[in-house]
Amino acid sequence: MNLETMRIHSKAPLPGGIQDRNEKNRPSLKSLKADNRLEKSKYKPLWGKIFYLDLPSITICEKLQKDIKELGGRVEEFLSKDISYFVSNKKEAKYAQTLGRVSPVPSPESAYTAETTSPHPSHDGSSFKSQDRVCLSRGKLLAEKAVKDHDFIPANSILSNALSWGVKILHIDDIRYYIEQKKKALSALKKSSASGKDAGKKAGPGIQKTRTGRLKKPFLKVEDVNRCYRPFYLQLPSLPCINYFLQKPCSPFDIEKSSSVQKQAQPKLRINMDGDKCGTPVQLQLKEKRKKGYCECCLQKYEDLETHLLSEKHRNFAQSNQYQVVDDIVSQLVFDFVEYGRDTPQKKRIRYSVGSLSSVSANVLKNTAPKEKPLLEPNFQKDVGESSGHLLKPNSQYEETQKPEEKHGFASEPTTYSSAGLKGCDRKPVSMFNASEPDPEQEYAQLPLRDSTPEHQVTEGRNDGEQRVDPAPGVSQSCGQVSHLSTESNLPQPQLAADITQLSAKDLQEKGFHVVIGHASDLVALNTSKEQLTMKARTPPCSPQEPHECDTENMENLPCGKIQRKVRMLLGQQKANAEPSAELDKKRTEYLPAHEDRTCGSPVQSLLDLFQTSEEKSEFLGFTGYTENSGICDVLDIWEEENSSTLLSTFFSSPSTSAFVGF
């Protein structure tokens, strides 16, 4: 068989009327026929046709099934004899129809009449057949058909079964081409019919259907006079009442349900209705929003708390004796609550500044026996005394407990030591000129006056001696308490007052200095003023046998306050350093007389050495003094003219205008 002829037959369009031989034997197809078959075939060309799709692709199968249903066809899921067309995408489907039907009992006549009785006559006739086939025997024809079926259509396949049942076989390309042609024809037909309907509508009168009805009273209806817009309406359950007393943003037709919302949405500003021509807005005094709540005592809700508390029901509950037992127990408890920090008054921090330096002159006298008891008794003897290992006692026993190696001194500026400074003195030295915040535990007693004169006595327990200094006229008086300097701290003692005795009185008078030198001087005082520095000196020292004469001569010129030493010892190191301290005392007494004849050093260096220490755990406990037999002048070194103005300016500043920030 020629393959070109097979392609021509496969591309031929489907015939309009498909007739089956066994139509009478198919009762299911009779139900599909109807009287209006011609009308439906016009818009549904596949009406009454049943298709079976043998396609592996689901997407293509669904699309083709949709197109078939639009054209009036029906798709079955199972292959049977009732199927009209078998659609497949296999190659055998293109030429399977040209082979004719394979009869179960083939005969010589069937092969001859196969093409003539076929419902699909070929366009080119039976040109591919020859007259020799008529002369073929029955065996040859059977063998030829068996070879053809074996080569092109496999046995026992769906395609062979469809051929044996007489089902028309179509390729997918053929059915697609047929559907496209029918869609184009239907679209053209619909356009022509739609144009005819439009022409008929334009020719006829324009009648518009309207939905009419009756509104139930009461209602509101708004209509357009020109009738260009449709009316809108609103049916109400009851006729609203107009309220003229509502404020401006609210509608006069508001229902009572919105009254609560209306109160919450009151405006803050409104125009005065009484006739302010400028229309200035007046701010309304809105009432405070009442907070609703629930009373657990009365077991009821309330709108306002104050009104509920004043109600009779709540007052009866509050005045009842149900909780009298609890009140009695609470009244027996001890009130030991700590005051809250917010309630306690805040204490202002006192700031200290170095003001004008009080100029004093000192003369130290030695007495063999104490005559008076000390007048200053600190209130913190217990705290400081226990921590330092010494109790400050205002009697002779306290004076006897003092070591002869301990040194004492005066300070003209009021100085206090904080608790942090006392506790942490083993880590950092205490400075007299940079006082910290006063400790509330350190309270000093008031210095009483003696014989109506501003005279004060200083009693120090050093070698059972007593030292007295009196205030000088015209000089501000102040006393500072100084801690004693232990021998454990290796301070440069010889450099504190470096041999001032070598200076002659003549040199001192040229520079305006007067030196007061005592035989057993342990206290150093400097008398300064803003104009000049004056120191009154007596070169012949007082003998130990005449202490009262020296005392009476200098009592009028020596200012002083009552000074009580603060003693603090390191208890942990007291025993460990007992022997080294004794050796240091011996070396100290030997070292001081050896350097009596040295010349004075720089005044700045001597002042810096005053606050310098050589150990990390040492503490500043007072100005130093010397032994009885030293005979050294304990007056500070002479100020040089070029350095005196700059150095003294730090001490002559007013405490109200400036603050001391440090050296």
Swiss-Prot record:
Residue interval(s) of motif Integrase domain-binding motif 1 (IBM1)? 603-627
Which species expresses this protein natively?
Mus musculus (Mouse)
Q: Name one GO cellular component term.
A: nuclear body
Q: Where is this region: Disordered?
A: 1-29, 99-131, 369-480
User: Basic and acidic residues bias: where?
Assistant: 20-29, 400-410, 452-469
Amino-acid positions noted as binding Zn(2+) in the UniProt annotation, renumbered to this chain: 295, 298, 308, 314
Which purpose does this protein serve, as stated in its record? Regulatory subunit for CDC7 which activates its kinase activity thereby playing a central role DNA in replication and cell proliferation. Required for progression of S phase. The complex CDC7-DBF4A selectively phosphorylates MCM2 subunit at 'Ser-40' and 'Ser-53' and then is involved in regulating the initiation of DNA replication during cell cycle.
Q: How is it modified after translation?
A: Phosphorylation increases its interaction with PSIP1.
* Chain positions of motif Integrase domain-binding motif 2 (IBM2): 644-663
Residue stretches of biased makeup (Polar residues): 113-129
Q: Which UniProt keywords apply?
A: Cell cycle, DNA replication, Metal-binding, Nucleus, Phosphoprotein, Repeat, Zinc, Zinc-finger
Q: Name one GO molecular function term.
A: protein serine/threonine kinase activity
Coding gene? Dbf4
InterPro entries, A to Z: Replication_Regulatory_Kinase, Znf_DBF, Znf_DBF_sf
Q: What is this protein called?
A: Protein DBF4 homolog A
Record PTM Phosphothreonine, positions in chain = 344
